[in-house]
Amino acid sequence: PVNLRTEYLREPIGLDTKSPRFTWEYKGSEKNFLASRSEIRIGTSPDNLQPYTDNMTLEPHTRYYWNVTVWDQDGDICETSETATFETAKFKSSDWSGKWITDSHDKEFEPAPMFRKAFTLGKEIEEARVYVAAAGYYDLFINGKRVGENYLDPGYTHFDKRILYVTHDVTSLLKPGGNAIATVLGNGWHNVQSKAVWNFETARWRNRPRMLCELRLRYTDGTTEVIATDESWHTATGPYTYNNIYSGDKYDATLEENGWNAEGFDDSKWDPVQVTEAPAPLLAAQQMPGIRITEELQPVSMKKFSDKLYVFSFEKNFAGLSRLKVKGAPGTRITLKHGELLKTDGRLEQGNIRSEERRVG
């Protein structure tokens, strides 16, 4: 057996089901192979795996090891797979220690909220996991480094019924002594602030972005510690002065605060956060592959129309992020627009994009 998966994922670290589904593939040369029996063995140590049964109880925040043995149509053992792993996350609301937080602004306020907390670790860390739920999108940082490779997390739901949370391994980002955890929240699908297709601007769940975060630490001496969102966090706004899932972002670099997401930053002028109610009654693990950068593309051509207007063509349609390196005086405004078509003279054609969905900044 090869390609072992738990809940259809390879080596997942954030499962919230007590009865996961195990799958695998047969890789062999026998075309008429038929499996007559299989046995899954599971345990918290790779050296002590026991037969898996339906009444086996899994614990939250635990790594499990498993393999599978397959018998062929003649009743002979075909082979035993290599050992795979998965980790459970949270099974119920009482597994969470944190509180939902936001800032003091309402849903029409445009600048994106930023949050941070400094903390000190006095012991050697064995492993660390962070669990993040957000009404809106989040970018999470620990000691100034972005957590994970995913973008646009968490995924879309009916935000007044169910919110997804994402689990990250952040062991390598932490250090003994002073540390900091920080995040910036985007509106995403949760708070569309302009007229939009399917009337998202009138969605019943619309509200200011908010988050729930829990950093769970296990030390080498076997003890654990949890650092979670609560009243001790601080909040401010910064360079993201506008963000919209349809029409884009406005970013003002003059509002940047260097080191805001790192340890040692002075957040004494930041405001205290507002502890708020949960936006939905149900929290569920996001059990799907994340949206990630899989390829970097270079423009195929560049056409200059004036000293202030350039068109870069990639000659293909794709979803992605743009990276542009520029020089200019502070306060210089640069507008980056995207489109799927070009006009006959090579200029950008946005006529096939609804006016309210065109990028504004």
Feature names for model-found ranges:
Residues 1-359:
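Extracellular/oxidizing-compartment recognition motifs
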